[in-house]
Amino acid sequence: MSELLLELFSEEIPAFIQKDAEEGYLSIFTKIFEENEIFAKIQVFSGPRRITLYATHLPKVTLPKEIEIKGPSTEAPEAAINGFCKAHNVSKLELSTKLINNQLYYFYIKKVEERQIKEILPEIIVEAINKYSWAKSMFWGNYNIKWIRPLRNILCIFDSEILPLQFGHLAANNVTFGHRLTDNKKLEVTDFEDYKTKLTENYVILERLKREEIIKTSLLEQANSHNLTIKEDLRLIEEVAGLSEFPVVLCGAIPQKFLELPKEVLISSMRTHQKYFCLFDRSENFAPYFLFVSNGQFANSKLVVQGNEKVLSARLSDALYFYKQDISKTLEANLEKLAAVTFHTKLGSLKEKVERITNICKYIDPDNKDLITAAKLCKSDLVSEMVGEFPELQGIMGYYYAKHENLNEEIAVAIRDHYKPQGLSDSVPVGNAALLAIADKLDSLVGLMIAGEAPTGSGDPYALRRQVLGIIRIIIENKLELNLNSLIDFSLKLYSSDKDKDLIISFFEERAKFYFKNEYDISLINAVLDLNLANIKFKLDALKEFLEKEDGKQLLNAYKRASNILGSQNIDGAVEPSLFNTQPEKELFEVTQKLSLQIVDKDYDKALNLLQTLLTPITSFFDNVLVNDSDPKIAKNRLLILQDVCKLFHKIAKFNRL
């Protein structure tokens, strides 16, 4: 069996798309090989400057085969038959026929001779290279090819021989290059093992997962050597593994003066902006050290550490300056600055948004002074120097500035947490933060819907789906007894609008279904879904349990029977007991009347238990009473009884949706 080695050597490939390219090229090459009946074991490796494919167990030749090509019907016009023959360069006598669905068709049996694999590989390799679609690609020079970054070399060998492959201006060879530290020394290779060995000798670790494992192990070793801890950050490890061909973990020091900064500022400066790893002592306090991944084994690692310490100190010096500037002013002093910041061109400034949020909070809990104060100040940090430099710290800096002003913890936490949850995995805020989060998200939703920014199938630029799901989660997980319907009305009034309410309610219902869909059947969700979200999970569990019992199943069948008899008609009038002439209809009416007074939606468990007492009389009614009596008055009276029965079910859930 044979082997193929292909390396696409380029300028720096962004770290965040290397893994996708690895998986994408594996999929494309596998598919194209299979289409050409070449079956092989394929591996793809990615790194900062190369994408490598290694295929083994390749045959040396393709197997001869016959391809059956369907032509026109034997009854088709002669011109169509001649056209088919001409297209395949055969005569009519060379065609065979086959009966398909009582119709005779011409077929051409094309014989494909065996071919040397090395003859067809260049063509399908170029096809595969072109087929992968990068998120963004580029042209360079005057060349007519495009790739994620300028390609500098293509290595392609099949059984130690260079394949005559041409991709744009690049002809394949048997040369690769080591780490930049080796001055891009040319390395001639004969096969995969030779390739891998020479790369390792020249400070290139081919396998992405191996680089990640080296980084992970080295981080723990460095942390332990300083008697410190490090929090696992797989995403950052994956990213720095894509930035380094030969990762070496080094440790730098943080000057003590910077430790007065909030820990989130330190983490953001190091992790997000510098790709550094933070260290903590055994009590989880921030340690005055950081770890970073160097791309290569430098002779003077101290110089590398000093360089990184200098870069971090410069960034933290700026952060400390911004922080001191910010705490010299109050959050309230920033309110006027919000007037100059646009929330949305059709919806005014952030100052106007804050006023609306505050009004919604007053509507929710008019006597809650902490909530109202938090609402007034919740966006003030957006015009701070620190958030201008580190936008990801919005809310967090507001918390620290509120604490610096000696505002109480409840206000500070509400300012910090009102952006939560920021995804399905994020926790929901509690207390005043929960109410403020609802007010903020609801104002955004209502305003942006009015502004015509409703999500579409192709996009949701304002993340309204996430914001509505956030409101739903906050209400459900905090068991908040909020009248969402009236809240939507109030929010619409703040925009002096009464349009789009139905669209907004429909949007809430759609996201609620999404929230529950993995746990409950959609018909069950539809049966209990309304804007009173606080008890919806309890209702779902209770109704699910009820319908799994034998009594519940029988009652549902009885409801459906009653509903089917009634159809879509809405019968006017009230039941007249004087028209009863059977005991079952009298008993069903009496139980229905009694239950209509006892069943209350809020006491759901009790309501379902009471509903079970309907089973015996309704079963007896259907077994012994003819609804469509010959006397029209009696027939109508019995239909009215069934209508009352259905209304009783509807007090508990929309049973017509089950």
UniProtKB/Swiss-Prot annotation:
Q: Which UniProt keywords apply?
A: Aminoacyl-tRNA synthetase, ATP-binding, Cytoplasm, Ligase, Nucleotide-binding, Protein biosynthesis
- Which Gene Ontology terms describe the biological processes this protein takes part in? arginyl-tRNA aminoacylation; glycyl-tRNA aminoacylation
Where it sits in the cell: the answer is: Cytoplasm
Q: Name one GO cellular component term.
A: cytosol
* Complex formation: Tetramer of two alpha and two beta subunits.
Hey, which family's this protein in?
Answer: Belongs to the class-II aminoacyl-tRNA synthetase family.
Q: Write down what this protein is called.
A: Glycine--tRNA ligase beta subunit
Species of the source: Rickettsia bellii (strain OSU 85-389)
Q: Which gene encodes it?
A: glyS
